[in-house]
């Protein structure tokens, strides 16, 4: 049986602003759009952490639950919770089969967490994952570099709009969450 997949998640820390955006499309296989308004970006840990997922929906919900438990266990320490989740994800036989990736951020860090055990912090304060991730990443980097007066939210929305114009698995039903200083 084919799974539900494909999305684009984009996150940026820019000019003191922190934003994460995701589209709303859920695709079944390669031919059918099952939902247009899914919410793939969430607020966690007393609204101080943003998390977005790309991949299998059921797998992503499992990871959200595990990550939120790690945040509670480590009192909101994003980096420690991320490393501990990645270690568990990589070493657990059941979790290892999950097909999803997470981007998580707070006001101090922006991180990519993968099932192979990586926890990656970007050099430029921008991350993107999912089927339209490379398009969003390119657009976001260009905007950050050449239109530095834009807010983090404006760049996140524009990056998702660009990805949605190119990637058939990304739509224009964009959800944006922000953290403010």
Curated annotation (Swiss-Prot):
Q: Which residues cross the membrane?
A: none
EC class, as a word, reads hydrolase
- Where is Na(+) bound in this sequence? 164, 167, 170
Q: Where in the cell is it found?
A: Cytoplasm
A Gene Ontology biological process noted in the UniProt record is:
proteolysis involved in protein catabolic process
- Determine the domain of life of the protein's source: Bacteria
Spell out the protein name for this chain.
Answer: ATP-dependent protease subunit HslV
